[in-house]
From Swiss-Prot:
GO function terms (MF aspect): glycerol-3-phosphate O-acyltransferase activity
Organism expressing this protein natively: Cucurbita moschata (Winter crookneck squash)
Family: Belongs to the GPAT/DAPAT family.
Encoding gene, per UniProt annotation: ATS1;2
Pfam families on file: Acyltransferase, GPAT_N
Alphabetized UniProt keyword annotations: Acyltransferase, Chloroplast, Lipid biosynthesis, Lipid metabolism, Phospholipid biosynthesis, Phospholipid metabolism, Plastid, Transferase, Transit peptide
GO terms under biological process: CDP-diacylglycerol biosynthetic process; phosphatidylglycerol biosynthetic process
Transit peptide extent on chain: 1-82
Protein's UniProt name: Glycerol-3-phosphate acyltransferase ATS12, chloroplastic
Stated role: Esterifies the acyl-group from acyl-acyl carrier proteins (acyl-ACPs) to the sn-1 position of glycerol-3-phosphate. The physiological acyl donors in chloroplasts are acyl-ACPs, but acyl-CoAs are used as artificial donor for in vitro reactions. The enzyme from chilling-resistant plants discriminates against non-fluid palmitic acid and selects oleic acid whereas the enzyme from sensitive plants accepts both fatty acids. Squash is chilling-sensitive. Does not seem to discriminate between the acyl-ACP thioesters 18:1-ACP, 18:0-ACP and 16:0-ACP.
Record note on domains: The HXXXXD motif is essential for acyltransferase activity and may constitute the binding site for the phosphate moiety of the glycerol-3-phosphate.
Main enzyme class: transferase
């Protein structure tokens, strides 16, 4: 999903729970300064949202300190806004010349031959070439599985463009800023991502829960309010899937959501073109913070910059931010194979709440559930190396949002600040889990619209 400005030169008083906040934000993957992944990647190697409305990982920040630094001088908001506009929107205005051989491909045989020739010419590292071929084979099989009579045409069209974009990035690596705005010209990366993922969704077995609440969210954004979607996270394709399920009814949300993304989706060559088409707040994953000890401090500083960018955006109002406070993508229970939302980190939830509170703009946290794991399931375990195997399938997907949960009402029933924080996080998670179970009954249980409950009204608005 994802824009800015502010004034006030003093930091809003902190909530009574603590003077400084250790912020744990759960995200997916992204790339900033050289990371362990990017170092191993340049020779190879998604957790993405659109431009005008992954993957999950964890960050640690001092929210109060970052906010204080952010507002130290009266010119900071204006200068930072200018800098954000200059650095986060169009880092590649004019594309450099590069090999366009993939765009001339007219058959599967030519496509595979082109990968081989570009590798032999030294333009593609062998591991990237192997990843390209595997991606093509898996994508082709999934689209053919859909039964679309134009499957072959769709596969060739989408894959030639995807491989062209991957090769471009290998030749001229794209560098993400801490706040990245989706690139829409001269090449529209957002539409590219939408077109690529669309054939993988079985819309006949896909559902949106509580559609009217998405309209309420848009109205709040129009009023200048901020909205944070507290969500579970299932695949690298989550941003595109969310956008595709809402593009007919809520195009503003579909294109403008800002996704908090971890460094790995910004470092993997097979994933970067899709990330370029999404609005992102880029962070380094806590899970990979110490992969290369000498880079740890650089990563922490980059994360602090990202936090400041987010604070600036929120102070301007009308921001829609998606975040997964679980620390990673959902994974199936190893003993049963059943999928459930991964538990939320209470610190991550609390610090998003505090950022909203400190913005001096009305803000709302909505619990959002997403079910789409079969389309692009993650590896069974968290991997250190960049370049995971991408399993792809044609399947149904589900998205549901529930009413926002009042922090004040929960705080009124607890005396201990830590209990309040845990209870609020649990209330959000329980709502996500409840909605997820309804989507699961509708999609996996084949109950369709009949799975609707008093709390989740399902529809198919396409």
């Amino acid at each position: 999903m994802f824009i800015l400005s502010s004034s006030s030169s003093t930091l809003p008083s902190a909530p009574p729970f603590s003077s400084t906040t250790s912020i744990f934000l759960s995200f997916s993957r992204v790339s900033l300064p050289p990371s362990s992944s990017s170092l191993k990647l340049l020779p190879l190697s998604l957790q993405f949202g659109p431009p005008k409305l992954a993957s999950s990982c964890s960050l640690r920040f001092s929210a109060s300190r970052a906010m204080a630094e952010l507002i130290q001088d009266k010119e900071s908001a204006q200068s930072a806004a200018t800098a954000a506009a200059a650095s986060s929107g169009y880092e590649r205005r004019n594309e450099p010349a590069h090999s366009r051989k993939f765009l001339d491909v007219r058959s599967e045989e030519e496509l595979l031959s082109c990968i081989k020739k570009e590798t032999e010419a030294g333009k593609l590292p062998p591991n990237v070439a192997a990843g390209m071929e595997e991606l093509y084979q898996n994508y082709r099989n999934a689209v053919i599985e859909s039964g679309n009579p134009k499957a072959d045409e769709i596969v060739l069209s989408n894959m030639t463009v995807a491989l062209d974009r991957i090769l471009l990035d290998v030749e001229d690596p794209f560098v993400f800023s801490s706040h990245h705005k989706a690139i829409r010209e001269p090449f529209d990366y957002y539409i590219f991502g939408q077109n690529y993922i669309r054939p993988l969704i079985d819309f006949g077995n896909s559902f949106v829960g509580n559609l009217s609440l998405f309209k309420d969210i848009e109205e709040k954004l129009q009023q200048g309010h901020n909205v944070v979607l507290i969500s579970n996270h299932q695949t690298e394709a989550d941003p595109a899937i969310i956008s595709l399920l809402l593009e007919k009814t809520n195009p503003y949300i579909a294109e403008n959501t800002i996704f908090v993304a971890g460094d790995r989706v910004l470092a993997d060559p097979l994933c970067k073109p899709f990330s370029i088409g999404r609005n992102l707040i880029c962070v380094y994953s806590k899970k990979h913070m110490f992969d290369i000890p000498e880079l740890t401090e650089t990563k922490r500083k980059a994360n602090t910059r990202s936090l400041k960018e987010m604070a600036l955006l929120l102070r301007g109002g009308s921001q829609l931010i998606w975040i997964a406070p679980s620390g990673g993508r959902d994974r199936p229970d190893p003993s049963t194979g059943e999928w459930y939302p991964a538990p939320f980190d209470a610190s991550s939830v609390d610090n998003m709440r505090r950022l909203i509170q400190h913005s001096d703009v009305p803000g709302h946290l909505f619990p959002l559930a997403l079910l789409c794991h079969d389309i692009m399931p993650p590896p069974s375990q968290v991997e250190i190396e960049i370049g995971e195997k991408r399993v792809i399938a044609f399947n149904g997907a589900g998205l549901s949002v529930a009413p926002e949960i009042s922090f004040e009402e929960i705080a009124a029933t607890h005396k201990n600040p830590e209990e309040v924080r845990e209870a609020y996080s649990k209330a959000l998670f329980d709502s996500v889990a409840m909605q997820y179970n309804v989507l699961k009954t509708a999609i996996s249980g084949k109950q369709g619209l009949g799975a609707s409950t008093a709390d989740v009204s399902l529809s198919q608005p396409w």
